[in-house]
Amino acid sequence: MKTTIKQAKQHLNQEVTIGAWLTNKRSSGKIAFLQLRDGSGFMQGVVVKSEVSDETFQLAKEITQESSLYVTGVITEDNRSDLGYEMQVKSIEVIHEAHDYPITPKNHGTEFLMDHRHLWLRSKKQHAVMKIRNEIIRATYEFFNENGFTKIDPPILTASAPEGTSELFHTKYFDEDAFLSQSGQLYMEAAAMAHGRVFSFGPTFRAEKSKTRRHLIEFWMIEPEMAFTNHVESLEVQEQYVSHVVKSVLKNCQLELKALDRDTSKLEKVSAPFPRISYDDAIKFLKEEGFNDIEWGEDFGAPHETAIANHYDLPVFITNYPTKIKPFYMQPNPENEETVLCADLIAPEGYGEIIGGSERINDLELLEQRIDEHQLDAESYNYYLDLRRYGSVPHSGFGLGLERTVAWISGVEHVRETAPFPRLLNRLYP
């Protein structure tokens, strides 16, 4: 009977066959231990010399790392294993013998591992990170589907920039100029006027020449937009969504979190509602903490965000930033016209901003004024202005960066480990 490592527990004390790769092995004179993986998980295969043919035992001692195999044996309980079971191997068939696998069990430098990313993905820790990424995506669809959102796919080739910045990848669209999308937000706002509550999930591209542990050139975003929704209501959706994702990972990725040595005590405290601090109060807090390198009207850097998040030891919303440091489309704060109704959600443990969101301007005249102030091409935004001409309503939205969220929940140091094939400054291979 053929099965997988993940499903093998259903076949305790039965003989099964598993297709797998050999990740590592050790042996003595009378017993060999094979570390097997098949994509669904990792399992130990035990080969006892007295219980198999001489040929099988010799093969078990000689198999090379990453050779592909069919391994047949009996699944037995093993309380020492993370899985709770292992295989008592009876026979081994080599599908393909690997030679000189470059990523050996010893430590390797980051550049070497990134050059061999297509192979590094096979390691237990990288496998765990990708499984957690997959669970976050699954939980995302679950949350938005259960809360009445419609999935919409905005274009990746665009004629304008939602953020109104110069950090764009330029290309030609036949005889026209086009750009790789920085965000699907403006299109999602249009979709929200048709469907009420919408979300997108797709790649975005930013030509930022940044080498920090938080930045990728290509990354994936979840971007919901909600009609008839104000800023406070949007914050409630955001914290419910993030709480749902964290709880889903804690429930469904216990083996992966253990493989990463992730301290889950902080994740277990993540539950809506999240603390909130205004930009004004955040500046005061930082001054009191001895930060003299920031003044009102300036954006926060990584050390500032980390200090604020560490104070709460939870995800925290920083609200109502100054108008001049935020994009053109954000609704003014009626209590202070120098600020806007927006928030960034800062993850604890130094992982920084994972969500940016705001209430959107719904008044045509004000939006036209903002486009002019930001010296943007009004004609490129004509479709966006139409949303304010025909049945405009209060509406809000946000964007969550998938890779930063994966980094935070999995506890990895750098976002390069959270994308299967990361695109970084000066790295386009593999």
From Swiss-Prot:
Keywords: Aminoacyl-tRNA synthetase, ATP-binding, Cytoplasm, Ligase, Nucleotide-binding, Protein biosynthesis. GO terms for molecular function: asparagine-tRNA ligase activity; ATP binding; catalytic activity, acting on a protein; nucleic acid binding; transferase activity. The keyword Nucleotide-binding applies. The gene is asnS. The lineage of its organism: Bacteria, Bacillati, Bacillota, Bacilli, Bacillales. HAMAP family: Asn_tRNA_synth. Belongs to the class-II aminoacyl-tRNA synthetase family. It is found in: Cytoplasm. PROSITE patterns: AA_TRNA_LIGASE_II. Homodimer. It is an enzyme of class 6 (ligase). NCBIfam families: asnS (TIGR00457), PRK03932.1 (NF003037), PRK05159.1 (NF003483). It catalyses: tRNA(Asn) + L-asparagine + ATP = L-asparaginyl-tRNA(Asn) + AMP + diphosphate + H(+). One of its GO terms (cellular component) is cytoplasm. GO terms for biological process: asparaginyl-tRNA aminoacylation. It comes from Staphylococcus haemolyticus (strain JCSC1435). Its EC number is 6.1.1.22. This is Asparagine--tRNA ligase. InterPro entries: Aa-tRNA-synt_II (IPR004364), aa-tRNA-synth_II (IPR006195), aa-tRNA-synth_II/BPL/LPL (IPR045864), Asn-tRNA-ligase (IPR004522), Asp/Asn-tRNA-synth_IIb (IPR002312), NA-bd_OB-fold (IPR012340), NA-bd_OB_tRNA (IPR004365). It comes from the Bacteria.
